Amino acid sequence: MISSLLLASACVPAWGSHAYALWGEPRYAEGFSHFDYVNAKAPKGGELRLVSNLRISTFDKYNPFTIKGSSPAYLAELMFDTLLWPSLDETATGYGLLAEDVQAAADGLSATFRLRPQARFHNGKPVLAADVKFSYDTLVGPHALPGYRTLFFDVAGVDVLDERTVRFRFKQPNRELPLTVGAIPVFSRDWGVENGKAKPFDQVVMDIPIGSGPYK
């Protein structure tokens, strides 16, 4: 019993940092309120109209991660949060967004993220480690854009360590990989579930996305 408890505790890391920097130290200290280039007092509300950056004037699906069809411009960026968020006044640095902490292993073969307890999807459910693993498994699966399999080629797998802790294992040491997996869009396991059964991802077409981003 004691040995099993010790083994379980050994799987969960001592926590690292609020940010991950490829070079040097993060510019912003833990607990910072906003990036320097952001106007924290900017008025809220109103309507924002964005012009598509593609030669597409319409859309026929809400799923931006599958091959067939066209989704609205910027949908992925506006509706789905990521584990880390890059700052625009630094090079190769990510700060915790869905994740409150990130730890890169000393041997470079894994990165572990602890999720914020207050992180919620648009349906009110908490963002859990199982959702992160589900998002990864779905994006590298046969029904998603093949570019994701290329992007995550050096990821060996994803482990759910506990409800709020997820670990990405790497095939070989690469200091950029924590930033790569930190940018994965996270969506709910409930997205595409119909009558209690999950549809194949390429059949999730007009189902309203269940993300945690600023827009829904």
Regions found by a protein language model. Give the residues of each.
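N-terminal cofactor/phosphate-binding cores enriched in small/glycine residues
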Residues: 107, 111-113
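Alpha-helical secondary-structure segments
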Residues: 49, 128-135, 163-169, 213-214
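N-terminal lobe/hinge region of extracytoplasmic solute-binding protein
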Residues: 15-107, 137, 208-214
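Sec-exported extracytoplasmic/periplasmic mature domains
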Residues: 37, 84-88, 107, 120, ...
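Extracytoplasmic/secreted proteins, especially bacterial periplasmic and envelope-associated proteins
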Residues: 27, 78, 97, 127, ...
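Surface-exposed binding/hinge segments that line
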Residues: 114, 150-195, 214
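Bacterial N-terminal signal peptides
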Residues: 2-10
